[in-house]
């Protein structure tokens, strides 16, 4: 409010008045009071936005600085079959990029496998809506797959893990 008091009344204009080109001196006292209130309200709104952005930034910085924010739990770190070894692929937790390394599996069969997870056994893959040619391709790699216990921490990135070539 002290900021508003230090501004000459001639320069304070509301958006409507600036369109008409009228300053506060040319207005009635009640209109001048309303215009001053509008300016104060706008200043308070900007102050509120600045405080919100500052608080949100501080919260984000605290979260981003925390090593636990992006780390999997200790149990998740021991999950195998995520694609490092193509002869041992966990169909419940492997990312779609793993299937790119298996000719004929990507993109159609891979999307169906990931979309239908979790599975109790590899045999459940044949209950997916696959053509005979796709089932033949699946049989080709069947010995490379196993149905591990689904890990919630890995489920969110099964289609796009954010790692690009």
Curated annotation (Swiss-Prot):
Disulfide bonds: none annotated. Pfam families: PsbU (PF06514). SUPFAM superfamilies: PsbU/PolX domain-like. Signal peptide: none annotated. Might be translocated into the thylakoid lumen by the Tat system. The position of the transit peptide cleavages have not been experimentally proven. Its main location: plastid. Residues 1-45, 46-65 form a transit peptide. GO terms for cellular component: cyanelle thylakoid membrane; extrinsic component of membrane; photosystem II. Keywords: Cyanelle, Electron transport, Membrane, Photosynthesis, Photosystem II, Plastid, Thylakoid, Transit peptide, Transport. It is a peripheral membrane protein. The keyword Secreted does not apply. It is found in: Plastid, Cyanelle thylakoid membrane. One of its GO terms (biological process) is photosystem II stabilization. Belongs to the PsbU family. PSII is composed of 1 copy each of membrane proteins PsbA, PsbB, PsbC, PsbD, PsbE, PsbF, PsbH, PsbI, PsbJ, PsbK, PsbL, PsbM, PsbT, PsbX, PsbY, PsbZ, Psb30/Ycf12, at least 3 peripheral proteins of the oxygen-evolving complex and a large number of cofactors. It forms dimeric complexes. This protein is not detected by antibodies against green algal PsbU but it is detected by antibodies against red algal PsbU. One of the extrinsic, lumenal subunits of photosystem II (PSII). PSII is a light-driven water plastoquinone oxidoreductase, using light energy to abstract electrons from H(2)O, generating a proton gradient subsequently used for ATP formation. The extrinsic proteins stabilize the structure of photosystem II oxygen-evolving complex (OEC), the ion environment of oxygen evolution and protect the OEC against heat-induced inactivation. This is Photosystem II extrinsic protein U, cyanelle. The gene is psbU.
